[in-house]
Each structure stands twice: as C-alpha cells, then as structure tokens.
Design a protein with these regions (language model features):
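GST-like domain detector, emphasizing the conserved glutathione-binding G-site
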Residues: 1-129, 133
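GST-like fold's C-terminal all-alpha helical module
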Residues: 101-199
Length: 206
C-alpha cells in the first residue's frame, strides 16, 4: 500500500496525514513534488486523471483519489477511534459539517488561491483577480459564520468528539492563513476551537 502525497502546506494531503496520525496508522508515502509538477506527469495521471494528490494505491494495485474517500477506506478497516461518527445522528452531523466546511470555506479559499495569489499566477496567468478579491470576503464571512455556530459551547465542530469534520476545517483554516487569509480577530469561538485542535499531536506532527 502506498500513499502518493505532498507535504505541508498542501491541504488535501494533510487531511489524510492527520487522519492516519489520529488512527496510529503508518502507510508508505511516495513524495510527489507539486512544485516540480510531478502530479501532472503522464505516469502519475494514470493513477489519477485529474493529476491531484493524495492518491492511495491499495495492496491489490487499485487507486483511490480524494482525501475523504481515502480516509473512509481506512475507516472501514480501522473503525476505532471513530472519525466519521459514533451513531447515526453523530455520523450525519460529521457529514453535514464536512460538506459545510468544503462548500462554505474551502471553495472560496480555493478561488483566492487560484485567482488572487501571485504564487499561482505562473500556472494560471489568466487569473480573475476581481473574483479572487470577492472570494476573500466570502471566505471571511464563512469564518465568521462558523464562529457563530461554535458559540453554543461545543468542543468540536460536529459535537462532543473530534472527527473528520475538524480535520477538514483545520486544514482549510491553516491553508487560508498560508495564503494570508487568517481568521478574523472578532472570531473568538473559532480561534479557541483552532487552538484546541492545533494542540493535538496529530496536527503538530503534520
């Protein structure tokens, strides 16, 4: 089994890295250097036609792309500690917050990175800068909304337990900071949550 992956700050691979650390699992990693465009090489594109990391190669030579799909694959074989919910309602809350984090925060964050960051202009010379700037506002509003949601005193995003939803949001928040879109100062609940999950050994190790 091999995990084709990239190091920090790549946010999607990091989701899998944190998940594996929480599970105490070790998987052989193949460092796929994105700055060298190794993920766009013809041989890699046979593993994932979208040319993206992470990609998991299973023991029988099959390939799984997308970070959540990879983590769900591992969850089937290693259900403890449960990262996708402990009962039907809990599982629904985890799924709800994964989707909310992806749609509300990750989507505008990605547009800021693609259309408003000078580091991506090399591979995307036709940036829509106005849309990128607009996405900064959408991203900030998403963070403020999550801050309000966390105002009910819950310890973690989907409830009382640390789950995959926390991993998704953490990796998004940290990558947003990498592209100079940090959490608003007036988001105390989000900042307190971020401090809690960032203190976990799995986050510190990745």
């Amino acid at each position: 089994m091999k995990l084709y992956t990239e190091n920090y700050p790549a946010p999607n691979p990091r989701k899998v890295h944190i998940y594996l650390a929480e599970k105490g699992l070790t998987v052989d990693r193949v460092h796929t250097k994105m700055q060298e465009r190794q993920h766009k090489a013809p041989e890699f594109m046979k593993k994932n036609s979208l040319g993206q990391v992470p990609v998991l190669e299973t023991e029988d030579g099959k390939f799984i792309s997308e970070s959540i799909a990879i983590c769900r694959y591992f969850e089937t074989f290693h259900p403890a500690p449960p990262m996708f919910g402990r009962d039907p309602f809990d599982a629904a809350m985890v799924e709800m917050w994964i989707r909310r984090a992806e749609f509300r925060l990750w989507n505008p964050m990605g547009q800021v990175w693609i259309n408003a960051d000078p580091r991506t202009a090399i591979v995307n010379p036709n940036q829509f800068k106005d849309y990128g700037e607009h996405s900064k506002k959408v991203l900030a509003n998403a963070m403020k909304w999550i801050d309000r949601e966390l105002g009910d005193g819950r310890e973690f995003l989907a409830g009382a337990h640390y789950t995959m939803a926390d991993i998704v949001l953490l990796c998004g928040i940290d990558f947003a900071k990498f592209i100079h879109q940090d959490m608003p100062d007036d988001a105390p609940n989000l900042r307190a949550w971020h401090a809690r999950v960032s203190a976990r050994p799995s986050a510190r190790a990745t």
